[in-house]
């Protein structure tokens, strides 16, 4: 798959807006690379584009239910279809988003871990729900000592590690280390937008206030009504845990706002370091104007 643009960077760095401008100038289609913006029930809290506002096509936004099991492997298959479709239409695919695991899988490929059987997946989830994070973590590292590097509160990765060791008898970390990974793309330009941090932090704070002033509370109430298991990815989207705590009368709305803003800022701070370490050969930009100028007239 040839001639693809990847626009990434920390949350609230301005990726979406700059991607629209690039798409307008280069006959492009925007394809989502944000692991939370795939969910159709939570467009406000995940800051999904308002598709009717734009004159360019957007793909893979709000098309998966929060109740569905989804993975980076499934997303890669959906991505391939969208790139082929864009190429057939003679349009430039512009992959946009900040989910590190998704971007890493595009550039370096996926480890060839066997598909997990449904019964193993079900039993693992049931075990996790019965034991809770702490006891489940202890059980996991007893079966797979390499899993000690995982944080016991990262339930998504704990479940995945347990499923793999349970079905294959081999640590997920051994699979990743010892299998050959095939890159998804052959010819692409990776652009990382890294504006000044204080600018990003300011945007994070303002964006969450704007969400509160819209229908985000109603959106989270609806999410709660779906009884989604708390370890599902959608339940960990920025702002969701804090607003759920507010709706359950555990904290005030002011505390929810302040905590969500703080946690999102901390996440953005980690993203700055992660992008620089993971993609040293990428093109880095500290402003949207600089990025626009560098890829002017980037054509298929």
From Swiss-Prot:
Residues 34-37 are annotated as: Interaction with substrate tRNA. The record marks 99, 121 as: Interaction with substrate tRNA. ATP binds at residues 9-16. It catalyses: adenosine(37) in tRNA + dimethylallyl diphosphate = N(6)-dimethylallyladenosine(37) in tRNA + diphosphate. One of its GO terms (molecular function) is tRNA dimethylallyltransferase activity. Its cofactor is Mg(2+). Substrate binds at residues 11-16. Keywords: ATP-binding, Magnesium, Nucleotide-binding, Transferase, tRNA processing. One of its GO terms (biological process) is tRNA modification. Its EC number is 2.5.1.75. Pfam families: IPPT (PF01715). PANTHER family: TRNA DIMETHYLALLYLTRANSFERASE. Monomer. Belongs to the IPP transferase family. NCBIfam families: miaA (TIGR00174). Catalyzes the transfer of a dimethylallyl group onto the adenine at position 37 in tRNAs that read codons beginning with uridine, leading to the formation of N6-(dimethylallyl)adenosine (i(6)A). This is tRNA dimethylallyltransferase.
């Amino acid at each position: 798959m040839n001639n693809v643009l990847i626009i990434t960077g920390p949350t609230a760095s301005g990726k979406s807006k700059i991607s629209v401008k690039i798409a307008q100038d280069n006959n492009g289609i925007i394809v989502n690379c944000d692991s939370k913006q795939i969910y159709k029930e939570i467009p406000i809290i995940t800051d999904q584009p308002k598709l009717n506002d734009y004159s360019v096509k957007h793909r893979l936004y709000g098309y998966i239910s929060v109740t569905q099991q989804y993975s980076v492997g499934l997303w890669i298959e959906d991505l391939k279809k969208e790139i082929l479709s864009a190429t057939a239409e003679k349009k430039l695919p512009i992959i946009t988003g900040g989910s590190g695991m998704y971007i890493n899988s595009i550039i370096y490929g996926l480890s060839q871990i066997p598909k997990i059987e449904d019964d193993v997946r079900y039993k693992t989830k049931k075990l996790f729900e019965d034991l809770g994070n702490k006891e489940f973590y202890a059980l996991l590292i007893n079966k797979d000592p390499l899993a000690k590097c995982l944080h016991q509160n990262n339930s998504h990765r704990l479940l995945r590690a347990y499923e793999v060791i349970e079905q294959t008898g081999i640590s997920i970390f051994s699979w990743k280390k010892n299998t050959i990974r095939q890159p998804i793309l052959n010819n692409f330009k990776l652009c990382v937008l890294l504006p000044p941090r204080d600018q990003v932090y300011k945007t994070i704070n303002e964006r969450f206030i704007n969400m509160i002033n819209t229908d985000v509370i109603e959106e989270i109430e609806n999410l709660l009504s779906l009884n989604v298991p708390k370890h599902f990815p959608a339940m960990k989207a920025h702002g969701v845990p804090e607003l759920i705590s507010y709706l359950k009368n555990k904290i005030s709305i002011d505390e929810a706002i302040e905590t969500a803003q703080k946690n999102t800022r901390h996440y953005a701070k980690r993203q700055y370091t992660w992008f620089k370490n993971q993609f040293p050969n990428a093109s880095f930009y500290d402003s949207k104007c600089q990025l626009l100028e560098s890829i002017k007239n980037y054509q298929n």
